[in-house]
Amino acid sequence: MKRFTLVVAAVFAVTRSFGAVSCEKYDDGRPDKSVRNEFNKMYPDAKDVEWDAEAGYWKVSFEKGNQPNRIDHEAWYAEDGTWVRTVSEYPVAKVPQGIKDLLSGSQYGELPLEDREVEYFETSSYGKFYRFDLWQNGREIKIDVHESGEVLPASYDVM
């Protein structure tokens, strides 16, 4: 009986350790080592990592955190490993109140939200901002609320 208990404990420990290991998938080949190194430096605790080549960039989808607080992210890198942007999906409830106040005090403040998720952009060229999907006259519009206080229609590509 003692041996059986030890075997069960060992199997449990091994399977738990596999669950904590981050697996990587490469759908479009494998990015250069400089790209992978930059990603690993920026996001050492990333889980469920998937790489894709898209529009001349490497896009890596990953998760951070544990349930129920796990957050989905996408980081984009140039071919040389230069970080371009990271987009994270947060529940509206997790958006800082100051950002929500900026949106509600703007001309878009009365428009209903399209869904309960908000994208948070960190970019190398446009700074940091939250992107809200809102409904206006039966169609979806995207509004960016910058941490600097600007509230603007999302009219530019963030690459």
Description of each model-found segment:
Residues 1-30, 39:
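Bacterial Sec-dependent N-terminal signal peptides
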Residues 31-50:
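Post-signal peptide N-terminal segment of mature Sec-exported envelope proteins
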Residues 39, 46, 60, 99, ...:
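Short, structured motif recognition centered on aromatic/hydrophobic residues
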Residues 47-66, 112-131:
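A cross-family detector of function-defining hotspots
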Residues 57-88, 131-158:
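Amphipathic N-proximal alpha-helical interface segments
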Residues 79-114:
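Long, charged/polar, surface-exposed segments that mediate recognition or autoinhibition
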